[in-house]
Amino acid sequence: MNPFPRAEISSSALQTNLAALRQQAPASRVMAVVKANGYGHGLLNVAHCLVSADGFGLARLDEALELRAGGVTARLLLLEGFFRATDLPLLVGHDIDTVVHHSSQLEMLEQTVLSKPVTVWLKVDSGMHRLGFTPEQFSTVYDRLMACPNVAKPIHLMTHFACADEPDNTYTSVQMAAFNSLTAGLPGFRTLANSAGALYWPQSQGDWIRPGIALYGVSPVTGDCGANHGLVPAMELVSQLIAVRDHKANQPVGYGCFWTAKQDTRLGVVAIGYGDGYPRNAPEGTPVWVNGRRVPIVGRVSMDMLTVDLGQDAQDKVGDSALLWGKALPVEEVAEHIGTIAYELVTKLTPRVAVCLA
């Protein structure tokens, strides 16, 4: 078997996670967020596995066009909207919805001649202060969109939460109240809830939920695990041992002689490194799953390899599988060891890692 790392994607896990989220929000439609190459799981792979989703959320127009070219006919929404007037005919031609969050987008809609109107989701800045129109701007912007012949009616309404992944933080309630007050009585769909909103803030679920990381079996909350919500990891990042070596006490290993063995042991070298997207800053003790147990990384992660301490009496051999994260070793646990979030780990795999449906 090829010793190089691969990300094995489970279609059944993706479908299980979609079903679990529907159960969490039975009155809502699901806008499956597949931006950033399906959170590293493969854009078309994920979309085809989640064909029963009601729509897909994307960050960029090229992602939406790839889905249309791949035969995806569901509703598509550009979560950051469009950036050039020349994008608008593509939205029309490929039946792609757009978020409008900035005055420049509004002006382009007003000034461009289109063959038919575009479906717009007006983004309200309810407190995240990143994208969207402030409550003070909302009424004027809404009226301009209503008057614009290039905008399909009704206009849909959305916001995004800053702290929904902190279940005890009341700021999410503040944002919900601001959004609901501002949009009361207006027609159109409403969408507020990301993964954390769908899982932890049921009152935010609205007409559509927009789950991202949860679809891939990962909890959005630090210290939590997707399995606690009936979610199954969709990615197994696997490689192999390409060397097993006896190692003497007081001998270092790796660049900079960063780690020194306290006793005689056996070391395993795994064929994965920062050239594959595994973080170079993974500290000593970060777990890897080998033959049914966690073994710690020792020494520095290099471009193509990392080293694990298998233990003095280990019987592991060259060619044995090494799981970097997956069902047996949740990516949330690995991320916590490294001091990052699971989102970053799954989306930063490089093209050297083969992504395949398992």
Curated annotation (Swiss-Prot):
Top EC class for this record: isomerase
GO cellular component terms given for this protein: cytosol
Enzyme Commission no: 5.1.1.1
Active site (catalytic residues): 35 (proton acceptor), 255 (proton acceptor)
UniProt keyword list: Isomerase, Pyridoxal phosphate
Cofactor(s) this protein cannot do without: pyridoxal 5'-phosphate
GO molecular function (one): alanine racemase activity
GO biological process terms held by the UniProt record: D-alanine biosynthetic process
InterPro entries, alphabetized: Ala_racemase, Ala_racemase/Decarboxylase_C, Ala_racemase_C, Ala_racemase_N, Ala_racemase_pyridoxalP-BS, PLP-binding_barrel
UniProt catalytic activity: L-alanine = D-alanine
Modified residues (N6-(pyridoxal phosphate)lysine): 35
Pathway in which this enzyme or protein is active: Amino-acid biosynthesis; D-alanine biosynthesis; D-alanine from L-alanine: step 1/1
SUPFAM superfamilies, A to Z: Alanine racemase C-terminal domain-like (SSF50621), PLP-binding barrel (SSF51419)
Residue numbers binding substrate: 130, 303
PROSITE patterns, alphabetized: ALANINE_RACEMASE
Function per UniProt: Catalyzes the interconversion of L-alanine and D-alanine. May also act on other amino acids.
Recorded family membership: Belongs to the alanine racemase family.
HAMAP family reported in the protein's UniProt record: Ala_racemase
Stored NCBIfam families: alr
Protein name in the entry: Alanine racemase
Native species: Shewanella baltica (strain OS223)
